Regions:
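Extended, non-globular alpha-helical segments
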Residues: 394-434, 485-523
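Glycine-rich phosphate/ribose-binding loops and adjacent secondary-structure elements
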Residues: 330-332, 432-440, 444-446, 452-458, ...
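Short beta->alpha connector loops at strand-helix junctions that form conserved
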Residues: 41, 448-450, 469-472, 560, ...
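Structural motif
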Residues: 238, 408, 425-427, 446, ...
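Conserved alpha/beta-domain cores
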Residues: 93-94, 517-519, 527-879
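Nucleotide/phosphate-binding sheet-loop regions of phosphoryl- and nucleotidyl-transfer enzymes
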Residues: 1-389, 415-418, 422-425, 432-434, ...
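Flexible inter-domain linker/hinge segments
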Residues: 208, 215, 377-405, 409, ...
Length: 879
């Protein structure tokens, strides 16, 4: 039996989403429920996949099935396609299995020709309606199917309205519209070299192909990447009998939700327009009326709609987004789907549906997407204000939140103005660790270069600052202190605004509203926590970040980067002395200055954690990052004075630190191998801090010491011996011992494939997936943004491997290391501390491979908690 590629609505059901797409499955389900659905058929997602496999051709067997389904639908309608007296017209719409509103294409009124439009005008005794439908169809078909610029058609309409002195398209007469149709067909012939097609079957097949093609249009590709929708799913095509909302004042069209999608309030929410077609509502040319007014204008239709809406929500057990048309007083349902909603509404609806007895706690947890929580935790722009603000540029949405401030081009300037309580946006080509203070005092960060895991992105997320990175449209002149975007020049102190959730950069100031976490949030997250197995820690380097993360539900620190503490203004001089020292004695003298500062940092962190665990990563970055640039004369002179050498000698030493490839150079555990005294100082700081806080507060602290960038067992054994020897001395001096653990970051591919050997020394593994991704692909994460766009365009990649874990490659190394490590040490604790720890799909993977915890930026902690709950619930359900 031939494979079935086309299903009539009556042949499908809601469980066939993968085959029929969301729209097709729901149209089938509404048909089965006996609702007034204009009939039609769905061409499956498998037909779309085959269309691409066959070289963008629809196979003859699929064409035959489409024509057979068309004949069945004609019988139901009692009309014929292309008939000159009573023509059968259809809409052609996309429908992927995941909702992608507005991303793909729609064509209405298909089947109209020069002959059938006359029949439609005579049949309805309404030539205005018939020619209005025809001009809409020609414009849509030309735009969507043939890619003729739609502004050419809009210009003709504007010309006619101006000539006739009217405001709206509907105010043009039937004779005007006949002339518009002639002009539209002329535009089509000018572009295509042939007349507008007059065979409805040709129109239909071209439209189906266009919907398949639209699966790969730029906005659909971007939307898929943003929402983790696989590119090989394809879209279905729904061919549906047309019903008309533009047949006079007893006709109309609208969109409604069973609950308020902004607040979650249990109240019908929606709009409609009389004498209009669907796109009129969306286009916003006319102001729609609230659906409550329909009760006055058409009480019977309104009551029927309320009954259907109630039935649909009860059936789908979720808030529904419905499209409907009223044709001459008769209601038709064109679509239902689970409605898109704000994060606040999602929480309220989930909690309310549990209270109403509709959902279990676990089912409710699955109703909220983890990424949605982002917007709850950061300040947001006022919705009305942001609509009016001009967008001047767009970059990568690296760290969510809304920020408005004056622009400054150096971290020092940003910090200076920030300390004066001014609102600041730090604008840089790219940020470096030295910019940390300026970033801290900024509301937002904007960079020309860098990707989603660049320094600016990672640090901004950790701080909860809005950040837009990789905004290539910007031109920065640091000397003149100007930012040029297009032909507009901004000077230091001029105001711009950033939306870190969308990547938009706006001109001027936009009012913001603080994020408010509702009681529903705490209750909902309690249900999520009860369901998950995976623990969630945070990446934090300051007590403030730690407290914020604990407030968001972090169960400890999975990554405390000690180098961030070294950049503080009061200690960078001592750090530089240590780096540029010639002898061990000089180095130890400088380290003695740093020790009390580092110990004080750890004490503050342990107190903020209140007994929760903390993994401290020893010094990791290349040393050149800590020293001043050779052209920073004041800093060089001061350093020379402190070291008792000349400025020229300091410059010589700085130049000697230069490396061709610093990310694979003298960093990580290699620093401890060459300078053991650094590891000694850090061990003292960690253990003495733990002892002091244990004595003072009574917490049961078990320090976790993590050695970075280990590639072999011997490397780890060498550094671990320094830790153990120093620990012995500290315990003797303090007259007290503590349990502590030494582990390593798995971030070099060799460490992953020899994990069984490394586990002989390591008591825990933490996967540093930022570096592991970088080294596995051979990509520099700070430069990958220059070519990843081409990889997306050419379908080599569907998502950024630095933002979403590459489970096929990097993930296999994680899986291998986990398995090998536990063969050696069955109780080996496993975590992940790269930025992937806050990505929902990556958290899902971590659950599957049996990790103990994920660690992420403080503002991503709730997202990881919810993603971990999703993973556990879906596993339980066998999905």
């Amino acid at each position: 039996m031939a494979k079935k590629y086309v299903y009539l609505f009556k042949e499908g059901n809601a469980n066939m989403r993968e085959l029929l797409g969301g729209k097709g499955a729901n149209l089938a389900e509404m048909t089965n429920l006996g609702m007034p659905v204009p009939q039609g058929f769905t061409v499956t997602t498998e037909a779309c996949t085959r269309y691409y496999t066959d070289g963008k051709v629809i196979g003859d067997d699929i064409v035959e099935q489409i024509y057979a389904a068309l004949a069945e639908t004609e019988k139901v309608a009692g009309k014929k396609f292309g008939d000159d007296k009573d023509p059968f017209l259809v809409s052609v719409r996309s429908g992927a299995r995941a909702s992608m509103p507005g991303m793909m294409d729609t064509i209405l009124n298909l089947g109209l020709t020069d002959v059938s439009v006359v029949g439609l005008a005579n049949l309805t005794n309404n030539p205005h309606f018939a020619y209005d439908a025809y001009r809409r169809f020609i414009a849509m078909f030309s735009d969507v199917v043939m890619e003729i610029p739609k502004n050419e058609f809009e210009a003709v309409l504007d010309e006619f309205k101006e000539k006739k002195g009217v405001k709206y398209d509907r105010d043009l007469s039937a004779d005007d519209l006949k002339e518009v149709v002639v002009r539209f067909k002329e535009i089509y012939k000018k572009h295509m070299g042939v007349d507008f097609p007059q065979d409805p079957k040709v129109q239909l097949m071209e439209a189906v192909k266009a919907v398949f093609r639209s699966w790969d249009n730029p906005r659909a590709i971007y939307y898929r990447r943003m929402n983790d929708i696989p590119g090989d799913w394809g879209t279905a095509v729904n061919v549906q009998s047309m019903v008309f909302g533009n047949m006079g004042e007893t006709s109309g069209t609208g969109v409604a939700f069973t609950r308020n999608p902004s607040t979650g309030e249990k109240k019908l929410y929606g709009e409609y327009l009389l004498n209009a077609q669907g796109e009129d509502v969306v286009a916003g040319i006319r102001t729609p009326e609230p659906i409550s007014h329909l009760q006055e204008q058409m009480p019977d239709v309104y009551q029927q709609f309320v009954d259907i809406a109630t039935k649909l929500e009860a059936h789908y057990r979720d808030m529904q987004d419905m499209e409907y048309t009223i044709e001459r007083g008769k209601l038709y349902m064109l679509q239902t789907r689970n409605g898109k909603r704000t994060a606040a509404a999602a929480l309220k609806i989930a909690v309310d549906l549990v209270d109403e007895g509709v959902l279990s706690e676990e089912e409710a947890v699955l109703k909220v997407e983890p990424k949605q929580l982002d917007t709850l935790l950061h300040p947001n722009f006022d919705a009305a204000a942001v609509k009016k603000a001009p967008v001047i540029a767009k970059g990568l949405p690296a760290s969510p939140g809304a920020a408005t401030g004056g622009i400054y081009f150096t971290a020092d300037e940003a910090a200076e103005h920030g300390k004066n309580k001014e609102k600041v946006i730090l604008v840089r080509r790219e940020t470096t660790p030295e910019d940390i203070e300026g970033m801290d005092f900024s509301q937002g960060i904007l960079t020309v270069f860098g990707g989603m895991t660049s320094h600016a992105a990672v640090v901004a997320r950790g701080m909860g600052r809005a950040a837009v990175v990789g905004c290539g449209a910007l031109k920065i002149d640091e000397e003149a202190k100007t930012l040029t975007v297009g032909d507009k020049v901004y000077h230091e102190g001029d105001f711009i605004s950033l939306d870190g959730s969308t990547g938009n950069v706006y001109d001027g100031q936009i009012a913001t509203v603080e994020a408010s976490i509702s009681g529903e949030f705490a209750r909902f997250m309690g249900g999520a926590d009860a369901a998950r197995r995976l623990r969630v820690r945070t990446n934090a380097d300051t007590p403030r970040d730690t407290k914020q993360a604990v407030k968001f539900g972090a169960e400890g620190i999975g990554l405390c980067r000690t180098e961030h503490m070294f950049f503080e203004a009061d200690r960078i001089a001592a750090v530089r002395e240590m780096i540029l020292a010639d002898t061990k004695e000089q180095r130890e003298k400088a380290l003695a200055k740093i020790l009390p500062m580092q110990q004080g940092d750890f004490e503050a962190m342990y107190k903020a954690l209140e007994g929760k665990p903390m993994t401290v990563r020893y010094l990791d970055p290349p040393l050149h990052e800590f020293v001043p640039h050779v052209d920073m004369k004041e800093e060089i002179d001061e350093l020379a004075k402190n070291l008792g050498i000349t400025s020229e000698e300091v410059i010589h030493k700085i130049n000697a630190l230069h490396e061709s490839n610093p990310m694979m150079g003298h960093r990580g555990c290699r620093l401890a191998v060459t300078y053991p005294e650094i590891a000694e100082m850090q061990t003292r700081a960690v253990l003495q801090a733990a002892i002091d806080v244990t004595r003072e507060c009574g917490y049961n602290i078990v320090p976790e010491i993590m050695i970075p960038l280990v590639g072999s067992k011997k490397e780890l054994a060498f550094v671990k011996s320094i830790v153990d020897e120093t620990a012995k001395k500290v315990f003797e001096e303090q007259g007290m011992t503590l349990e502590y653990h030494v582990g390593t970051m798995i971030e070099i591919p060799r460490a992953a494939v020899t994990a069984d050997e490394i586990a002989e020394e390591a008591e825990f593994f933490s996967f540093g997936t930022n570096d592991l991704t970088q080294m596995t692909f051979g990509f520099s994460r700070d430069d990958a943004g220059k070519f990843l766009g081409a990889y997306y365009d050419n379908k080599i990649f569907e998502s950024d491997p630095f933002a979403r874990l590459d489970t096929d490659g990097v993930g296999k190394l994680v899986q291998m290391a986990a398995k090998l490590g536990r063969q050696t040490r069955p109780n080996l604790k496993l975590g992940i501390c790269g930025e992937h720890g806050g990505d929902p799909s990556s958290v899902m993977f971590c659950h599957k491979v049996g990790l103990n915890y994920v660690s992420c930026s403080p503002f991503r902690v709730p997202i990881a908690r919810l993603a971990a709950a999703h993973a556990a619930i879906l596993e339980k359900m066998g999905k």
